[in-house]
Regions:
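Active-site-adjacent structural elements in enzyme catalytic cores
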Residues: 1-162
Length: 162
């Protein structure tokens, strides 16, 4: 900023914690608002709330599928969480048409590298089957380090387009 303070506009490949450590002797760093604010020019690309929203609605789920979800694809941070989502889908009686884990063991570098590829795969699987009212069900990604950037992208993908 004009006052010399470093400002993180969007979480990305270098975790905020690492930036804070490097910039500690230079005034530190503050995180900007995660989305564009009304009446304020957008500070960086990708700051709209639904910037990453796929054509098939994405829902972030931790404990149960929302009522009425009967057709879905599943996206999880790791294999263990994917097994959990599969159990939630089975409990809800939902048909699962495709499922993927971003990595086997919460490898945030691998997850970040494959996030959009996996989202497109799930979206294509549901669209190619012409599954009506289908949803992509995703588990939130754990915050911290590169995980914060992945979690941010998933929240934006789940946002209703403006």
């Amino acid at each position: 900023d004009a006052d010399g303070t470093a400002r993180l506009l969007r979480h990305g490949g270098i975790p905020l914690e690492d930036l804070a450590h490097v910039l500690a002797d230079h005034g530190g760093i503050v995180a900007a608002a995660p989305t564009a604010q009304p009446g304020v020019p957008m500070q960086a690309p990708g700051m709209t709330e639904s910037h990453y929203a796929p054509m098939v609605p994405l829902l972030l789920v931790t404990t149960a599928l929302p009522a009425g979800v009967t057709e879905c694809a599943l996206l999880a941070p790791d294999r263990a969480t994917l097994t959990h989502l599969e159990g939630l889908a089975a409990a809800a009686g939902a048909n699962v048409h495709a499922s993927v884990a971003l990595s086997e063991t919460l490898d945030s570098v691998a997850a970040a590298a494959h996030l959009f590829e996996r989202l497109h795969e799930l979206e294509a699987a549901l669209i190619s089957r012409a599954v009506p009212a289908a949803r992509i069900i995703a588990a939130p990604y754990p915050e911290g380090g590169l995980g914060s950037a992945i979690a941010d992208r998933l929240r934006r993908a789940a946002a209703t387009p403006q």
